[in-house]
Amino acid sequence: MEGAPLGPLALRLLLFVALPASGWLTTGAPEPPPLSGAPQDGIRINVTTLKDDGDISKQQVVLNITYESGQVYVNDLPVNSGVTRISCQTLIVKNENLENLEEKEYFGIVSVRILVHEWPMTSGSSLQLIVIQEEVVEIDGKQVQQKDVTEIDILVKNWGVLRHSNYTLPLEESMLHSISRDSDILFTLPNLSKKESVSSLQTTSQYLIRNVETTVDEDVLPGKLPETPLRAEPPSSYKVMCQWMEKFRKDLCRFWSSVFPVFFQFLNIMVVGITGAAVVITILKVLFPVSEYKGILQLDKVDVIPVTAINLYPDGPEKTAENLEDKTCI
């Protein structure tokens, strides 16, 4: 898939954060306290399906998206960061007659892609903007088409919600559309309440540490083959190591995000200092040139006085030896 343009999204994120911040600065009021209750957004997603006779049927898929204690839930199913594909039972509103707008509500099994992305607003701060997008893939085993995406933006700090709002944008311009479906995290367990033990959940890309021996059998729909039952595996050192490495990766990313600005500032100071010193030295050489070349050692002229050797034995060394022999004989 081709990448969607990020210009409108970046502008919305900037306005989403700048508008409340500017209000706090101008009024001089302190930062508003977090909302007491967890935000709960029941959104309706407009989709179209193709009937057996070739007619187009318009339907609405109702999803209940909540945020509580740093965790995003979709129909009480915990969803982590990234793109997760879940299959769950939810309410579907079907328009039987478009002229009279007669609606028929029923519960069906839907397959939906959920994007959860966390945007750190400032380095070293717990202020984050959580972006949630959703795309319905199937309803009761039938392919559907979706044109618009409802984006939910939640501004949180220390797991407390400061503000949340909804936007509607075309599917082609969303981040979810630009991410390939091959990288989705599959979540095929039935709808479990978030009040139950989350440790019994098992996905195809992440495993929680809890010894659970159970299998989940899927209710086979008409015209659909059953999937292989999932069995929770006992904990192993490999899974624990994967969790440690994931935590280490997040800590390392947080560390580099705080170190990089300081490193680049230091590098900027070094480059500016070396360049400035070279310019100053060049200017000084031009203004005050050196007349003498100091590379050659210059010596003062010294008068050389010849030294004459004085011979203490003018008769030669042979006569001196004879005189010594005569004195010895005497």
Curated annotation (Swiss-Prot):
Quote the InterPro entries the UniProt record gives: GINM1
- One Gene Ontology CC term in the entry: membrane
Q: Which UniProt keywords apply?
A: Glycoprotein, Membrane, Signal, Transmembrane, Transmembrane helix
Cytoplasmic compartment ranges equal 290-330
Signal peptide residues are 1-23
Where is it predominantly found? membrane
Which positions does UniProt annotate with glycan attachment? 46, 64, 166, 191
Give the protein name, as stated in the record: Glycoprotein integral membrane protein 1
Membrane-spanning intervals of the chain: 269-289
Q: How does it sit in the membrane?
A: Single-pass type I membrane protein
Q: Where in the cell is it found?
A: Membrane
UniProt KW Transmembrane keyword: yes
Extracellular compartment ranges equal: 24-268
